[in-house]
């Protein structure tokens, strides 16, 4: 099951496709409300376990329709989930050259330092412990915006990875 969220009166930018991988309904609701409250018009898709995340990203099973389920530009990933853990999903994504460029943000209730180190070691772009208030979550999203638009150096070439980077650089 997926939810897609958009806002017509949001600030003008090119929306990106974000995949939230989360099994806790309350955390899903908090994220949806934070996007709504912040008038973030990116497309947010939600899957509820690790295997479903890999199916979504690779376009397998019910996610074969790429118009309806596009490859995500950013993944928000919980660690503790059914079927496959967030670590297993992260390792699988980073081991596959088709998906290793997708930034993965660990958004999890674990504040364990070992999990932080393990996440970065497996290729996470960021680690955000929950609970995150709406305001704090919006600051995080704003921080990504600053990173992609101001700090990140983009390649001069025009290949698929540059186009993806250019798309990412324009979000929020």
Residues covered by each model-derived region:
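Short, glycine/charged-rich "phosphate-handling" switch motifs in NTP-dependent
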Residues: 125
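Receiver (REC) domain active-site loop signature in two-component systems and cognate sites
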Residues: 79-81
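Residue-level signal for the "D+5" position in two-component response regulator receiver
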Residues: 46, 83-84
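A Lys-centered signature of the CheY-like receiver
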Residues: 130
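Non-catalytic signal-transmission and effector/linker regions of two-component phosphorelay proteins
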Residues: 1-19, 25-45, 51-54, 58, ...
